[in-house]
Amino acid sequence: STSGEGRAIGSTYIEGGFAKRILVSTSSHNMAAEKQFRNPTEYGTPKPNTATFTSTGGVSILLSNKKSKVKVESSTIGKVVDMGTTDVNHMGAVMAPAAGDVIYNHLKDTKRDISYYDLILTGDLGIYGKNIPKDYMMTKYNIKLNDNYNDCGTMLYDLDRQPVLAGASGPACLPLVVFSY
């Protein structure tokens, strides 16, 4: 996500002494994304339940070299993990193996156990993609994601009351939850 990448790069600049304060911002808009990248809204094409709903919002965070209880302690950058999923209306399934892989690599790199964290979040896998990292990590690494795991795509909207299909998506999804929940 642009927010995560911005935090990783910005905190590295601050740690290296190249900056004192860095503002990291990201945004997404439902109708702009739908019209530009997905099914054009003018078509009125129905979407399958696995499709997600691009979140509308903007988030900015200020990174600073001042000591605080809240800090960027580490960053783990992921990679593409292609399991052959090609359904463009089920992006959660496309992204989920990479989410499981980056969680595993973070645990390995930091020499930590899953129970170290109060909360582990994925960005926008949605209700149908949310459980795939659980299965992936158990099958591939014998690691069980516990109740401390959730997906921001399932947290941003009230899935029972708002017509957002499989949940929220887009670059603002995770930071909208993390920095305002």
Model-identified regions with their sequence ranges:
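A generic, well-ordered mixed alpha/beta core segment in the N-terminal half of proteins
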Residues: 1-51
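Claisen-condensing/thiolase-fold acyl-transfer catalytic domains that form or cleave C-C bonds
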Residues: 1-18, 28, 66, 92-93, ...
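Short acidic capping loops at alpha-helix termini that bridge into adjacent secondary structure
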Residues: 20-21, 113-116
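Structural motif
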Residues: 23-25, 61-63, 121
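Short, well-ordered, mixed-charge alpha-helical segments that flank or form enzyme active sites
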Residues: 30-35, 80-84, 129
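Short linear motifs at secondary-structure transitions and domain/linker junctions
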Residues: 34-40, 94-97, 168-173
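Generic preference for flexible, low-structure residues
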Residues: 35-40, 88, 133-138
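Condensing-enzyme catalytic core mediating Claisen C-C bond formation in acyl metabolism
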Residues: 40-104, 109-112, 147-156
